[in-house]
Amino acid sequence: MKIGVFDSGVGGLSVLKSLYEARLFDEIIYYGDTARVPYGVKDKDTIIKFCLEALDFFEQFQIDMLIIACNTASAYALDALRAKAHFPVYGVIDAGVEATIKALHDKNKEILVIATKATIKSEEYQKRLLSQGYTNINALATGLFVPMVEEGIFEGDFLQSAMEYYFKNITTPDALILACTHFPLLGRSLSKYFGDKTKLIHSGDAIVEFLKERENIDLKNHKAKLHFYASSDVESLKNTAKIWLNLLRK
């Protein structure tokens, strides 16, 4: 099976890594719209337009499935993509919510959703969790994390200052939903900041389990072939994959 993975930039590499390590697919084509990142500050119509253009890009590869590894795109463009695509299209929000439900059986536990401004504004996570009976949900736009990841800043004083700024009035949550696929790249730093009490919900791990339960996919005895594309500076994208995620070998 050949699948496509789409993200606004390099953040979706966190989802790609989980899909790659799960050995569910024969070939994975990753496309990052790095020329127009971030999506989280753009309006709905623009996000849909960019996502439909990405869908057109994937048509040349004859993929069997498309994973939208971008929470903002999943929040605003999933219906439009499904209406146009001739193959299954999955977003990461349903998977993230499902993973949270599995992780937190006590619905009075505290949940913190961090994401781009657009994803928080969509209230997709908040509405879905409230509908499942969760009562203690905070949502916080932490958009500065996106360009930091794009620039390869995964730890250090600058990130520490940003976390202290964003989380200064936040009590330690029981679950932290990383509702932007850039944010798992900051996972080690976020775990260190909040401590062992906080369970991190990772879009990549969540989508793997989500797909296993919904698609008839056999485990492969080989790892998938990877192909990387970007709307600008594909070498930088490949470098991030190689250095941080260890996806590419020299």
From Swiss-Prot:
The active site is at C70 (proton donor/acceptor), C180 (proton donor/acceptor). Substrate binds at D7, S8, Y39, G40, N71, T72, T181, H182. GO terms for biological process: cell wall organization; peptidoglycan biosynthetic process; regulation of cell shape. It catalyses: L-glutamate = D-glutamate. Its EC number is 5.1.1.3. It is an enzyme of class 5 (isomerase). Signal peptide: none annotated. It holds the Pfam family Asp_Glu_race. Keywords: Cell shape, Cell wall biogenesis/degradation, Isomerase, Peptidoglycan synthesis. Pathway: Cell wall biogenesis; peptidoglycan biosynthesis. One of its GO terms (molecular function) is glutamate racemase activity. The keyword Isomerase applies. It comes from the Bacteria. SUPFAM superfamilies: Aspartate/glutamate racemase. Belongs to the aspartate/glutamate racemases family. PANTHER family: GLUTAMATE RACEMASE. Provides the (R)-glutamate required for cell wall biosynthesis. This is Glutamate racemase.
